[in-house]
């Protein structure tokens, strides 16, 4: 026996509600807990992205949510590796974990659908991640050869990555001039926390 028209409408409505709920959950990749890894701390006043991303147009929210979730994970991986390099202890395994993490994050970021107009920001973020990977490979080698942190911070790619993150911040400011302070500050501090300087 076929369902009545009323039953079919209710079933369709229920399915649409389920799909909408699933879609919203899938779009929110940002973690609820942003605590830094044990024994590390963020170098700036990092706060979680505000839920719903006030001030970010709806068409950009999924991209911004996914991007900043990845930037947070890259920052956490950076903190663990930087601690190992500073302490000159456990560098190789920390470098291997960092490489695996950031390569995966960069690959996912590179395959993300980029809203029109955000392409230069995307290029800066991916460029900064690549430069930081080069920086950390060189930094690990320097520390393992007995060099100090002054030599590590002299590695050119670290400054170049910093410049790309500053450019990324400028692009975000230009795109969202009317965003509220909580959104602006959180986005700024995500880029600041990933930076090396």
Q: Predicted segment positions?
A:
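Bacterial N-terminal signal peptides that target proteins for export
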Residues: 1-12
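Hydrophobic helical h-region of N-terminal Sec-dependent signal peptides
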Residues: 13-17
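N-terminal signal peptide c-region/cleavage motif recognized by signal peptidases
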Residues: 20-23
């Amino acid at each position: 026996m076929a369902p009545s028209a009323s039953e079919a409408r209710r079933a369709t409505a229920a399915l649409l509600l389920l799909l909408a709920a699933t879609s919203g959950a899938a779009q929110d990749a940002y973690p609820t807990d942003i605590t830094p890894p044990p024994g590390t701390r963020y170098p700036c006043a990092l706060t979680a992205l505000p839920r719903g991303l006030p001030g970010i147009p709806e068409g950009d929210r999924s991209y911004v949510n996914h991007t900043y979730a990845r930037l947070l994970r890259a920052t956490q991986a950076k903190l663990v590796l930087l601690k190992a390099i500073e302490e000159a202890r456990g560098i190789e395994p920390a470098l291997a974990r960092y490489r695996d993490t950031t390569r995966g994050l960069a690959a996912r970021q590179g395959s993300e659908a980029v809203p029109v107009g955000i392409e230069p920001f995307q290029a800066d973020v991916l460029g900064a991640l690549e430069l930081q990977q080069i920086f950390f490979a060189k930094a690990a080698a320097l520390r393992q050869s007995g060099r100090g942190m002054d030599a590590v911070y002299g590695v050119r790619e670290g400054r170049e990555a910093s410049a790309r993150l500053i450019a990324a911040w400028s692009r975000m400011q230009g795109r969202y001039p009317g965003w509220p302070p909580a959104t602006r500050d959180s986005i700024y501090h995500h880029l600041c926390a990933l930076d090396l300087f």
